């Protein structure tokens, strides 16, 4: 859809802020945390990590200018190819490359851990390396966007949320149609072995073994998300209150119960 600014197009997918495309660039209003994110994007560019947007400056309206990554985001309903085994392996490799690129990024005090982050700090986690922030082109993952909640933590913290959204580790398992994906209720006899296989594929492609406490980390991550949504809403943040009103909080609470009940079937 066209915005109030001529020749700009509002991009879909954001829960918290509006994002506009202008030619080969993306424009977003500056936030208090924007300068530190610009440092991160500059670091990634200097390290040759080609999957993130490049920070190009500030426009005449006081908005940040980022390079536009051509393709489509993993917005719901997902395309069938977005949940293929080959794509999952490529996402694992992309996350590994991100972690390698930030391995020497200075963990400045201005970057804070998100709720429930384990204390073992290894890298600056993206913290939202999720299917809806991955850009696909020619049916392959080609980019990762939205670094707004980046913060220090262990690499497995990123891996846990990536797998939750990209595998997915969910009470509704993807069922393929000709083009898009619809979801059916999880059936252990049908889906447990598929999830187990995809977990193995991801960790093999990432290059590390799955830790024994992996599912506890996934649960910790989802519980932290619930904590964040409730706290932000209580502080008067309308975007997070909208998430509650639209059922996001209840959804994640139900997912936590589901993983506690069925997660042992995947390990």
Residue ranges with predicted function:
Residues 2-43, 57, 65-67, 74-81:
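ATP-binding glycine-rich loop module of kinase domains
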Residues 17-21, 113-161, 171-174:
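Active-site acidic catalytic loop and adjacent metal/ATP-binding pocket
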Residues 45-58:
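Conserved HxN/HPN-centered segment at the entrance to the catalytic loop
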Residues 77-111, 115, 122-127, 132-137, ...:
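Conserved kinase catalytic-core helix
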Residues 110-116, 179-184:
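Short linear capping/connector segments at secondary-structure termini
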Residues 159-207, 222-236:
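Active-site activation/catalytic loop segments of kinase-like enzymes and analogous catalytic loops
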Residues 225-267:
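ATP/Mg2+ or Mg2+-diphosphate-binding catalytic cores
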């Amino acid at each position: 859809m066209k915005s109030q600014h001529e020749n700009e197009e509002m991009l879909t997918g954001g829960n918290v802020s509006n994002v506009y495309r202008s030619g080969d660039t993306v424009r977003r209003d500056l936030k208090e945390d924007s300068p530190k994110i610009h440092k991160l994007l500059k670091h990634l560019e200097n390290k040759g990590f080609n999957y993130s947007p490049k920070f190009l400056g500030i426009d005449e309206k006081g908005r940040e200018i980022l390079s536009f990554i051509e393709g489509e985001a993993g917005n719901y309903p997902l395309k069938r190819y977005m949940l293929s085994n080959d794509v999952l392996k490529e996402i694992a490799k992309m996350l590994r490359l991100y972690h390698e690129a930030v391995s020497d990024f200075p963990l400045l005090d201005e970057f804070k851990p998100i709720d429930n982050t384990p204390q073992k700090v290894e890298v600056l986690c993206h913290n939202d390396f999720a299917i809806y922030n991955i850009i696909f082109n020619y049916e392959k993952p080609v980019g990762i966007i939205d670094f707004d909640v980046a913060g220090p933590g262990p690499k497995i913290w990123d891996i846990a949320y990536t797998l939750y959204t990209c595998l997915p580790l969910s009470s509704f398992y993807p069922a393929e149609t000709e083009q898009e994906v619809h979801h059916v209720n999880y059936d252990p006899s049908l889906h447990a072995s598929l999830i187990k296989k995809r977990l193995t594929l991801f960790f093999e492609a990432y290059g590390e073994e799955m830790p024994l406490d992996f599912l506890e980390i996934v649960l910790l991550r989802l519980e932290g998300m619930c904590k964040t949504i409730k706290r932000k809403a209580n502080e008067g943040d309308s975007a997070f209150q909208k998430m509650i009103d639209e059922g996001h909080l209840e959804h994640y609470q139900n997912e936590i119960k589901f993983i506690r009940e069925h997660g042992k079937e995947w390990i």
